């Protein structure tokens, strides 16, 4: 027994030498009888990674310090000081405070009512206490160089895969009418872009930045699979953006590097002007497509060093993130009619009128970006059905005097190229273009992807533009259900905040880089525990 306790003390001692906790444990290796060989052996243990432990503490920049000067007092004011540690923030949520989900509603960061994002469900990717502090602070996350660089890398990858942004910029540069860019039209554009990207999967073999969403029930604390009632506040919208969808051969073993399979015109017609034709081609190719091909869901992580994260909780959260995406894609593909309704509820939760007309200038901009919807626009103009009953049978709740009319463009547009390509549309339309149209086509597209979804998922790690490592793993529905329920209980106030375990390894790998390190009562209490343990171990050694 004495020998095992001595070994424990030895381990603690070596951590003391390499950490900011050296003032807590104050006995030497000589006192514990540690040999040089034992020191060397302990030093080689995996959790004493020199690259991590010996990294100097990064002091905040002027901008970051200003950010902390605003955030830390705000959190201390809300949570109060810990009675045992004056000056340190309490790690318990005061009883008069709203639950975490209610605290997010109406903030600058979270302006959409009754909504969460996939990343917000990953409450234990780092430390849930830090996550909770940030939620109640209601201050947007500080965007340092790693975050900015990560966004740039995601944009670079998207631009390399899709020409949508380039085509749109080229059209808008010379277009003679102002093209709206408000949040309503941004949503319409993102739905259109996701539709085009998913079709491109079957020609180019990959798609990036594709929208998906699901719903989380408040009372039951679980993900919702069936239909959604629009005015039911118990079902919370959870939105996500899939970094990467990859088409591959089903029977080919998955290696560390999965290359997209370009089918060009083999399944669907490239540069097709009729999305209805694309759907018909996918329908006819269905059995053959499902037998030969599959679609992998993947997430892209950018790193500030050529190394994947070492913390198990971070890796688990990254896997769960991709599992959410995979799950949402499957549910969205189950029933096009239900998905159509879910998309409309999605828009309504964002505060948008699904019957509102999409500005004609925006519609022309979309067609200039990709002609895939051109024939559908003719159908709407002429009052014809698009072949999707929930949309074709729907009625618009608009004024009888409101008409969708592009006639003015005859007098406004002078660009011969635009006139030649789009003048057929410069007249009154029988049916307007609304979010309902894009919801209809997007719902059908999700349905065509569902049978191809692979149970193999992937995380791609990038450093300075180089995909240096991938992790491939299996979809685990049971783990996803358990984790989503645990997260729901946090957000909806059905359990207490659960900080990381108090041990030296966690202090080194988590607390060291936390904004709240200097004022966290949970860590301060952990330091005292370690100090007491060190004293007890020293006494054991002397006895």
UniProtKB/Swiss-Prot annotation:
Q: Which UniProt keywords apply?
A: 4Fe-4S, DNA-binding, Exonuclease, Hydrolase, Iron, Iron-sulfur, Magnesium, Metal-binding, Mitochondrion, Nuclease, Transit peptide
Q: Which cofactor does it need?
A: Mg(2+); [4Fe-4S] cluster
User: A single Gene Ontology molecular function, please?
Assistant: DNA binding
Q: Where is the transit peptide?
A: 1-39
EC annotation?
A: 3.1.-.-
Where does the protein end up? Mitochondrion
Question: Which terms in the GO cellular component ontology are assigned?
Answer: mitochondrion; nucleus
Q: Which domain of life is it from?
A: Eukaryota
One matching Pfam family, short form? Exo5
Which GO BP terms apply? Answer: interstrand cross-link repair
Residues that hold [4Fe-4S] cluster according to the record: 127, 511, 514, 520
* Cofactor binding, per record: Binds 1 [4Fe-4S] cluster.
Subunit architecture: Monomer.
Stated role: Single strand DNA specific 5'exonuclease involved in mitochondrial DNA replication and recombination. Releases dinucleotides as main products of catalysis. Has the capacity to slide across 5'double-stranded DNA or 5'RNA sequences and resumes cutting two nucleotides downstream of the double-stranded-to-single-stranded junction or RNA-to-DNA junction, respectively.
Q: Which family does this protein fall into?
A: Belongs to the EXO5 family.
What is the protein name given in its UniProt record?
Exonuclease V, mitochondrial
Recorded source organism is Zygosaccharomyces rouxii (strain ATCC 2623 / CBS 732 / NBRC 1130 / NCYC 568 / NRRL Y-229)
The organism's taxonomy opens as: Eukaryota, Fungi, Dikarya, Ascomycota, Saccharomycotina
Gene name as annotated: EXO5
């Amino acid at each position: 027994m004495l020998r095992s306790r001595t070994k424990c003390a030895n381990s603690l001692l070596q951590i003391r030498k390499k950490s900011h906790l050296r003032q807590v444990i104050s006995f030497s290796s000589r006192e514990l009888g540690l040999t040089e060989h034992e020191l060397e052996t302990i030093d080689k243990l995996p959790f004493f990674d020199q690259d991590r432990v010996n990294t100097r503490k990064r002091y905040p920049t002027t901008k970051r310090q200003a950010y902390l000067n605003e955030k830390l007092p705000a959190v201390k004011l809300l949570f109060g000081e810990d009675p045992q540690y004056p000056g340190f923030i309490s790690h318990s949520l005061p009883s008069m405070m709203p639950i975490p989900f209610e605290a997010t509603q109406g903030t600058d960061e979270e302006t959409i009512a009754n909504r969460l994002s996939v990343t917000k469900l990953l409450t234990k990717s780092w430390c849930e206490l830090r996550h909770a502090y940030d939620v109640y602070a209601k201050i947007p996350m500080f965007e340092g160089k790693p975050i900015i660089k990560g966004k740039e890398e995601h944009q670079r990858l998207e631009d390399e895969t899709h020409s949508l942004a380039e085509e749109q910029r080229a059209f808008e540069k010379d277009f003679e009418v102002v093209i709206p860019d408000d949040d309503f039209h941004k949503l319409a554009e993102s739905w259109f872009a996701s539709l085009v990207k998913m079709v491109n999967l079957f020609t180019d073999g990959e798609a990036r930045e594709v929208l998906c969403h699901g719903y989380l029930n408040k009372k039951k604390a679980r993900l919702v699979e069936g239909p959604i009632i629009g005015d039911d506040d118990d079902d919370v919208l959870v939105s996500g953006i899939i970094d990467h969808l990859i088409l591959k051969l089903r029977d080919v073993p998955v290696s560390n590097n999965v290359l997209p399979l370009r089918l060009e015109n083999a399944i669907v017609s490239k540069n097709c002007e009729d999305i209805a034709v694309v759907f018909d081609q996918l329908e006819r190719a269905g059995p053959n497509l499902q037998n030969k091909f599959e679609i992998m869901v993947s997430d892209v992580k950018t790193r500030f060093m050529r190394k994947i994260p070492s913390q198990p909780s971070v890796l688990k959260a990254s896997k769960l993130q991709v599992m959410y995406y995979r799950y949402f894609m499957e549910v969205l593909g189950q029933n096009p009619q239900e998905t159509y309704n879910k998309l409309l509820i999605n828009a309504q939760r964002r505060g948008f009128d699904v019957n509102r007309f999409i500005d004609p200038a925006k519609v022309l901009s979309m067609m200039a970006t990709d002609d895939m919807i051109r024939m559908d626009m003719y159908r709407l103009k002429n009052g014809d059905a698009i072949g999707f009953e929930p949309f074709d049978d729907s009625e618009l709740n608009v004024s009888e005097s409101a008409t969708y009319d592009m006639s003015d463009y005859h007098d406004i547009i002078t660009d011969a190229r635009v006139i030649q390509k789009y003048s057929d549309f410069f007249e009154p339309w029988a049916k307007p273009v609304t979010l309902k149209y894009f919801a209809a086509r997007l719902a059908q597209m999700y349905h065509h992807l569902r049978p191809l979804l692979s149970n193999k998922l992937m995380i791609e790690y990038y450093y300075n533009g180089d995909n240096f490592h991938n992790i491939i793993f299996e979809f685990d529905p049971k783990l996803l259900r358990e984790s989503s329920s645990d997260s729901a209980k946090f957000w909806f106030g059905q359990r207490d905040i659960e900080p990381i375990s108090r041990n030296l390894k966690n202090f080194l790998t988590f607390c060291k880089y936390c904004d709240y390190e200097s004022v966290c009562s949970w860590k301060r209490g952990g330091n005292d525990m370690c100090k007491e343990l060190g004293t007890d171990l020293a006494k054991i050694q002397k006895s």
